[in-house]
């Protein structure tokens, strides 16, 4: 008898649209209050007990929010907002959530006057256009000076643990991006061309960028060469073993010598593969799958170093740095498949682990980054800091424009909105409310820096912005200063931040019902 198909029940929550939108604003405000103290150079650290019972010490907005177990769908969408910001530009994860929550909170006052959400969303779209123009007006071009770039990257991680421990994350991030960045295509594929290796123990200052590839693999034979200059490298995808049948195979032997002959045929097949490889005179054979003991001994006799069972991602990076082209089987090997761009192969020890290091490459299109630290928790946090820094460095290369930091860009947007006259009463109020919401960033920077009266400082900042759009908050001292000499941020970070915040608010304002699905 056929089992009955389980039915789903849909429960429509019987709330009024205005009540649901107000609840969304409350949920957003609650989420933002968690990370309110994580903004600026005086940011506080959070100790997070993760879902797998490990401890993280961090002030990264995305790292904190992703560990929260929240029930309200609007709160979940804000957590996704932080993740998107982190994936796109690597910085501004805390700012985007704070902005979105504050803008949504301000819009609820307009909703209370029975203004339709669609009219508010339309006005928000117009306000976003004005904000982008304000950022464009405040933006300055980035010169090719490396010191300026490092200063900007360091500014994005000024509140992180790497700055407290004096680890040169900015230098590492810039060096890594320079190796991976393709100027002709204006692209920087960090995911496929860069790998971070965390090494427990050693000096923090020993962290480095390898101009090649670092692979955590042992050499198969203990007597194979461990240091090779200008190696010829061959990459093979198929195993160097006897090819077994696709399905289960049975052999029947009628004579005593047949079994011996079967073993000889297996050996001959492996020898043929090895002879084909030896024919192109390689120094190193990298195999994606296994290498049999017989093949291993043949390679060793011919002074060839063998590596087996490597990940596809490692093989892809190795191919890019040494110029080798992977082949599916040894029979296809030709001279053009041999990689000769690598200058040095070493089998070295980092901490307690052994690595195969391919360095001194002529035209490296990939790199490995070694991060060292005293404990696992610090290593994990340093890796997060580095990934944030490297994404900021990437945005600098792809879009070489800068904005004044310290809340100056937000105040410039607020000033522009206050100067703009809306086409109707709703637009005018949306502009005014959004301008008020944008001041949340400099306000929190002032609070976190320990200023006694933030409201007085904000009033002074508003007056200064009549003189120029580059005045902001010194997050360390709480003073109102010209931020062009203090802190600059990538244009991509600021534009992405305001776009994401406004779009998220528009999405939440359009929600007028919540449907729960239960089995």
Swiss-Prot record:
Keywords for the protein's UniProt record, in alphabetical order: ATP-binding, Chaperone, Cytoplasm, Nucleotide-binding
GO molecular function, one term: ATP binding
Top-rank taxon, per record: Eukaryota
CDD domains from the UniProt entry: TCP1_gamma
Cell compartment(s), UniProt: Cytoplasm
Main location: cytoplasm
Listed PROSITE patterns: TCP1_1 (PS00750), TCP1_2 (PS00751), TCP1_3 (PS00995)
Keyword Ribosomal protein: no
Pfam family, one: Cpn60_TCP1
PANTHER family: CHAPERONIN
Role description: Molecular chaperone; assists the folding of proteins upon ATP hydrolysis.
Protein name, UniProt field: T-complex protein 1 subunit gamma
């Amino acid at each position: 008898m056929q089992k009955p198909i389980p039915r789903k029940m849909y429960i429509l929550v019987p709330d009024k649209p205005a009540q649901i939108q107000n609840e969304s604003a409350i949920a957003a405000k609650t989420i933002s209050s968690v990370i309110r103290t994580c903004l600026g150079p005086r940011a506080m650290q959070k100790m997070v007990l993760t879902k797998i019972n490990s401890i993280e010490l961090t002030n990264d907005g995305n790292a904190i929010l992703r560990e929260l177990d929240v029930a309200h769908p609007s709160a979940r969408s804000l957590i996704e907002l932080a993740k998107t910001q982190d994936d796109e530009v690597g910085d501004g994860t805390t700012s985007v959530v704070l902005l979105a929550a504050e803008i949504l909170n301000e819009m609820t006052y307009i909703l209370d006057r029975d203004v339709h959400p669609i009219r508010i969303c339309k006005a928000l779209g117009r306000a976003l256009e004005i904000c982008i123009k304000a950022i464009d007006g405040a933006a300055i071009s980035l010169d090719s000076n490396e010191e300026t770039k490092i200063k900007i990257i360091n500014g994005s991680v000024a509140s992180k643990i790497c700055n407290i421990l004096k680890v040169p994350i900015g230098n590492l991030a810039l060096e890594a991006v320079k190796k991976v960045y393709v100027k002709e295509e204006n692209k920087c594929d960090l995911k496929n061309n860069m790998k971070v290796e965390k090494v427990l123990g050693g000096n923090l200052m020993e962290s480095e960028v390898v101009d090649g590839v670092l692979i955590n693999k042992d050499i198969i034979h203990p007597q194979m060469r461990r240091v090779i200059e200008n190696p010829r490298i061959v990459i093979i995808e198929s195993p160097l073993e006897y090819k077994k049948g696709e399905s289960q195979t049975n052999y029947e032997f009628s004579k005593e010598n047949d079994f011996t002959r079967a073993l000889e045929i297996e050996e001959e097949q492996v020898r043929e593969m090895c002879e084909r490889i030896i024919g192109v005179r390689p120094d190193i054979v990298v195999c994606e799958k296994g290498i049999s003991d017989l093949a291993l001994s043949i390679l060793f006799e011919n002074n060839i170093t063998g590596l087996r069972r490597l990940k596809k991602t490692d093989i892809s990076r190795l191919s890019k740095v040494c110029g080798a082209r992977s082949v599916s089987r040894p029979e296809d090997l030709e001279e053009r498949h041999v990689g000769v761009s690598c200058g040095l192969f070493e089998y070295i020890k980092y901490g307690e682990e052994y690595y195969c290091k391919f360095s001194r490459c002529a035209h490296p299109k990939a790199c490995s980054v070694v991060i060292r630290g005293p404990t696992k928790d610090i290593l994990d946090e340093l890796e997060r800091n580095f990934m944030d820094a490297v994404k900021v460095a990437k945005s600098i290369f792809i879009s070489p424009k800068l904005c004044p930091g310290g809340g100056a860009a937000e105040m410039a947007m607020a000033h522009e909105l206050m100067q703009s006259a809306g086409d109707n009463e709703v637009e005018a109020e949306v502009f005014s409310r959004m301008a008020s919401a944008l001041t949340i960033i400099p306000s929190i920077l002032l609070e976190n820096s320990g200023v006694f009266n933030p409201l007085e400082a904000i009033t002074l900042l508003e007056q200064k912005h009549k003189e120029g759009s580059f005045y902001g908050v010194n997050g360390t001292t709480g003073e109102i200063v010209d931020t062009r000499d203090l802190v600059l941020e990538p244009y991509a970070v600021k534009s992405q931040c305001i776009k994401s915040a406004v779009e998220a608010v528009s999405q939440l304002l359009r929600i007028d019902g919540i449907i729960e699905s239960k089995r």
